């Protein structure tokens, strides 16, 4: 009888233990499922590998190292016992045993810091950190499969769940999380959102409510109705007025993509639009399910046209007239003007849309339009982001405008950008289009349609707001039609444009609705409508363009900060590509892309090929100027670093004028600077950066009158090969900067203006040769070694780049980056981190200066110290130098300016100075008479009177 209660207690305990075990197992399964679904993203994140280059920097491979003291390896590194010459494996700290690769991060550095024998080095792989095992794609010069997404789409991460790159800004604990911890952090955010659904899903408190909207504000500055279905309400410019509160969503927002978009959207207006769009789609109120097809053909029309050199030499009796729609942005007005000059003819029409964020270019465009009756600028503006729905809205509104201009009797619609250029003459283009005046020219993808839909994201729902394309979930392609797509550059005849712009039939109406929520809509909308419309038999699979696709360089997912997708961009043409314009296999009349700031020589070659050479002695043919800033723009458009450097440039230029132009006993050539810069230009000569041109006001001390001068500042050479030179010959050049463009392989921050809060990138250019490993060492102005890592250089590598994860702020002064092979110096380069004289565009305050100019706390640029390498590299830290740096950090006012100018003067040269108007200095040259000034003659880009043949060039 005693055993019975014991047995019952034992059974109850066993039952409880079993339940507890089941609960633990269930929780474990749930956690694993959550992580697997998070990792899958859209089902493809894990397969992204190193190709998912959403960030601009390549990720290093930093294996853990178990090595003895560095000094013990130096004899082997220099060729002694145990060393290995060259190097095919990734190494760290000189030669050692080959090690297994694992992805590196700041967390990897932290793990090595906890190692009993920590390595002071990390290891990188070469250019872009990704080598595909697929067969190399054969480059076809006549290929024109133009799509803005990678061909190897299945291997690319299109997830929008990955944490976004953050500047460190004194938050090393966040930046140093290993990838798994970052995923945990993101998962916690998404789980928290799930728990708060219904009260704070928009990222705000439960008491904040947004009033419901039936219609959102338009993107057009003039408030034009772009179409009932083109959804001009997208806030592409990012300037939409924020409402005072958020409204609780009208449905249960459960999709991870929508939740991710809500956590990242910045404005309340955008968050409400995301929630509203998601709910309408979830309730089946957004997307059409079935669309009518009106094409009488059963299959796809395959019309091809041939290039006949003889047929286009004769102008037809009734030549077509063309409406060029020029969609432009940025600040490269001289290049835009040169392109416009090349395509201009008095019989055609030019309608210019300038991005609403490009105010300078818009002002210049208005000035351009006032000179010619057949040039007009849209009265409305949109923010045409890459891949955005706003591009389609821009084209549709432009079409409606052109059709309503009864004084412009055009026959063809051609869209161009400032990066395009003609490769055949206007007469040839007109003769060709006159022969095929009933055709529409679009380039199709030419591959498997299901794969195109998948890689183009047509089966995904996107929304544009806050100048970003947010991915919100999946959707179905409407039934009843064939979906097509390819290039978003096309030539359309007037009849089809009228149909697209004004038709209210089921096809056009529903396609406008569908493509209002589509990524890269202009790459598919016109193709799909044409192929399913009564005009389907007019489609020619050729958009008459050559596009410079180099997907190995152009598909770096460089637009992930703009779209939740992985996109591609064409490369700029270079002189070695000129032969491609002379091909006669198929009719082509335009090419892209061209950037004068990258390479102007190819534009000059093409210009001479089409229109003949300029007269001998024509000035400015090899020069290029691009305005970076002018005083009509708000001062806040300049960074504190740029404003600081421009003021220093002005002071150094005036000192040069005083030393070279001033005569003892006279003050006629002595000046005092007045105010902020008036304008700033980049200056290039023969495609080499020559520096900045700063236009500024001064007071002449002799007559106390205001004058306007322009100063030319050129950077000094800072790359230096070791002396005596080593026998290592692969390194050609090294540079440090920011805004690395992996596609064109250059720094977009020309001049490398850096401040204490910038994150510099080190770049090396290599010649061909055997696989080798080199060591890169970063040294701050007081000889503190801030970072060191190895790079494995493959035999075919041309460029490597890496951004070391340094703690901020950087100590102001001249930094050095040393490159060693087998611990023998090969070369070094220097760069300036400028102390700031401005903070938030105001003179810097003492407490701000101390915070920014003293380096990171305890000079700890990383968790790990590299101090043991100082004696090995003969880099001695001088206490007096450290103390002087500490004193410099407290400088403000004139003392700070003097320190800054001494640093700038060591890395920049004041080349020349000139006056833009009257001056009291008798020996001061006039800017328009120099060869370098932005006021110098530039005939190649200047417009003029229309010539008797109707052209400008």
From Swiss-Prot:
Uppermost EC category: transferase
Glycosylation site residues: 219, 415, 771
Known pathway: Glycan metabolism; chondroitin sulfate biosynthesis; Glycan metabolism; heparan sulfate biosynthesis
Assigned EC number: 2.4.2.26
One Pfam family from the record: Branch
Tissue expression summary: Detected in brain, spleen, kidney and testis, and at low levels in skeletal muscle.
Any one GO molecular-function label of the UniProt entry: metal ion binding
Reaction equations catalysed: UDP-alpha-D-xylose + L-seryl-[protein] = 3-O-(beta-D-xylosyl)-L-seryl-[protein] + UDP + H(+)
Localization (cell): Golgi apparatus membrane
Residue ranges of the region described as Disordered: 48-67, 74-251, 933-953
Sequence ranges of Gly residues compositional bias: 79-97
Polar residues: bias regions: 156-165
SS bond partners: 251-279, 295-536, 555-568, 557-566, 669-921, 914-927
Primary location recorded for the protein, binned into one broad class: Golgi
Role summary: Catalyzes the first step in the biosynthesis of chondroitin sulfate and dermatan sulfate proteoglycans, such as DCN. Transfers D-xylose from UDP-D-xylose to specific serine residues of the core protein. Required for normal maturation of chondrocytes during bone development, normal onset of ossification and normal embryonic and postnatal skeleton development, especially of the long bones.
Name the record gives this protein: Xylosyltransferase 1
Organism, scientific name: Mus musculus
Lineage: Eukaryota, Metazoa, Chordata, Craniata, Vertebrata
């Amino acid at each position: 009888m005693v055993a019975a209660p014991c047995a019952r207690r034992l059974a109850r305990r066993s039952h409880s233990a079993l339940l507890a075990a089941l609960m633990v197992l269930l929780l474990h399964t749930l956690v694993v499922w959550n992580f697997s679904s998070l990792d899958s993203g859209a089902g493809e994140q894990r397969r992204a590998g190193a190709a998912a280059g959403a960030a601009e920097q390549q990720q290093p491979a930093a294996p853990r190292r178990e090595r003895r003291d560095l000094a013990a390896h130096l004899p082997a590194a220099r060729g002694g016992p145990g060393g290995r010459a060259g190097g095919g494996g990734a190494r760290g700290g000189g030669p050692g045993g080959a090690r297994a690769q694992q992805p590196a991060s700041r967390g990897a550095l932290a793990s090595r810091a906890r190692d009993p024998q920590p390595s002071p080095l990390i290891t990188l792989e070469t250019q872009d950190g990704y080598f595909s095992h697929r067969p190399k794609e054969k480059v076809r010069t006549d290929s024109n499969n133009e799509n803005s997404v990678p061909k190897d789409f299945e291997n690319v991460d299109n997830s929008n769940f990955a944490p976004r790159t953050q500047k460190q800004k004194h938050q090393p604990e966040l930046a140093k999380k290993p990838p798994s911890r970052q995923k945990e952090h993101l998962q916690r955010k998404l789980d928290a959102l799930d728990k708060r659904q219904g009260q704070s899903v928009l990222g705000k408190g439960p008491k904040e409510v947004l009033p419901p909207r039936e219609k959102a504000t338009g993107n057009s500055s003039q408030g034009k109705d772009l179409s009932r279905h083109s959804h001009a309400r997208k806030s592409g410019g990012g300037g939409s007025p924020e409402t005072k509160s958020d409204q609780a969503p009208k449905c249960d927002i459960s999709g991870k993509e929508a939740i991710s978009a809500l956590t990242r959207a910045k404005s309340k207006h955008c968050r409400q639009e995301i929630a509203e769009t998601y709910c309408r789609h979830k309730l089946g109120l957004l997307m059409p399910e079935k669309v009518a097809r009106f094409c009488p053909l059963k299959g796809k029309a395959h019309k091809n046209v041939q290039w006949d050199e003889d047929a286009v030499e004769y102008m037809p009796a009734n030549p077509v007239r063309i409406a060029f729609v020029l969609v432009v942005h940025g600040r490269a007005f001289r290049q835009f003007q040169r392109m416009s000059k090349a395509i201009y003819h008095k019989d055609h029409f030019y309608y210019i849309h300038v991005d609403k964020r490009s105010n300078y270019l818009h002002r210049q465009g208005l000035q351009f339009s006032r000179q010619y009756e057949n040039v007009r600028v849209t009265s409305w503006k949109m923010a045409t982001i890459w891949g955005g729905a706003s591009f389609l809205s821009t084209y549709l509104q432009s079409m409606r405008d052109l059709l309503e201009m009864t004084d412009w009797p055009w026959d063809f619609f051609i869209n161009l950008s400032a990066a395009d250029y003609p490769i055949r003459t206007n007469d040839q283009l007109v003769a060709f289009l006159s022969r095929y005046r009933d055709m529409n020219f679009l380039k199709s993808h030419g591959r498997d349609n299901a794969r195109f839909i998948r890689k183009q994201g047509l089966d995904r729902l996107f929304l544009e707001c806050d100048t970003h394309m947010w991915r919100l979930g999946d959707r179905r392609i409407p039934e009843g039609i064939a979906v097509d797509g390819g290039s978003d550059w096309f030539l359309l005849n007037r009849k089809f444009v009228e149909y697209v712009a004004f038709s209210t039939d089921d096809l056009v109406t529903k396609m406008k609705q569908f493509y209002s929520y589509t990524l890269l809509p202009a790459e598919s909308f016109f193709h799909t409508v044409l192929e399913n419309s009564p005009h389907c038999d007019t489609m020619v699979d050729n958009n008459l363009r050559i596009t410079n696709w180099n997907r190995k360089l152009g598909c770096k997912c460089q637009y992930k900060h703009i779209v939740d997708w992985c996109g591609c961009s064409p490369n700029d043409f270079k002189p070695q590509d000129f032969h491609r314009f002379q091909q006669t296999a198929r009719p082509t009349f335009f090419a892209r892309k061209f950037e004068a700031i990258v390479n102007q020589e190819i534009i000059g070659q093409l210009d001479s090929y089409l229109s003949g050479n300029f007269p001998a002695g024509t000035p400015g043919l090899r020069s290029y100027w691009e305005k970076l800033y002018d005083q009509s723009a708000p001062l806040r458009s300049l960074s504190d670093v740029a404003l600081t450097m421009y003021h220093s440039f002005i002071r150094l230029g005036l000192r040069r004028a005083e030393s070279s132009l001033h005569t003892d006993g006279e003050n006629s050539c002595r000046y005092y600077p007045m105010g902020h810069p008036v304008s700033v230009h980049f200056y290039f000569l023969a495609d080499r950066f020559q520096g900045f041109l700063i236009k500024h006001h001064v007071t002449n001390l002799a007559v106390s009158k205001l004058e306007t001068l322009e100063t030319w500042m050129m950077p000094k050479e800072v790359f230096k090969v070791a002396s005596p030179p080593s026998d290592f010959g692969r390194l050609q050049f090294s540079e440090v900067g920011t805004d690395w463009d992996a596609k064109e392989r250059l720094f977009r921050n020309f001049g490398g203006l850096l401040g204490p809060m910038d994150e510099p990138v080190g770049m090396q250019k290599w010649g061909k040769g055997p696989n080798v490993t080199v060591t890169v060492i970063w040294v701050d102005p007081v000889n503190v070694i801030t970072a060191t890592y190895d790079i494995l250089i493959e035999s075919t590598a041309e460029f490597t780049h890496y951004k070391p994860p340094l703690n901020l702020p950087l100590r102001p002064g001249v930094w050095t980056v040393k490159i060693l092979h087998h611990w023998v110096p090969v070369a070094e380069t220097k760069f300036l981190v400028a102390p700031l004289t401005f903070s938030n565009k105001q003179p810097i305050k003492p407490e701000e200066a101390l915070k920014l100019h003293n380096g990171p706390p305890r000079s700890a640029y990383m968790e790990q110290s590299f101090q043991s390498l100082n004696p090995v590299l003969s880099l001695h830290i001088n206490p007096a130098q450290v103390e002087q740096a500490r004193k410099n950090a407290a400088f403000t006012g004139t003392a700070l300016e003097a320190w800054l100018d001494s640093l700038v003067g060591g890395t920049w040269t004041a080349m020349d100075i000139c006056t833009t108007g009257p001056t009291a200095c008798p020996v001061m040259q006039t800017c328009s008479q120099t060869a370098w000034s932005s006021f110098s003659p530039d005939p190649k880009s200047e417009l003029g009177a229309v010539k008797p043949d109707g052209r400008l060039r």
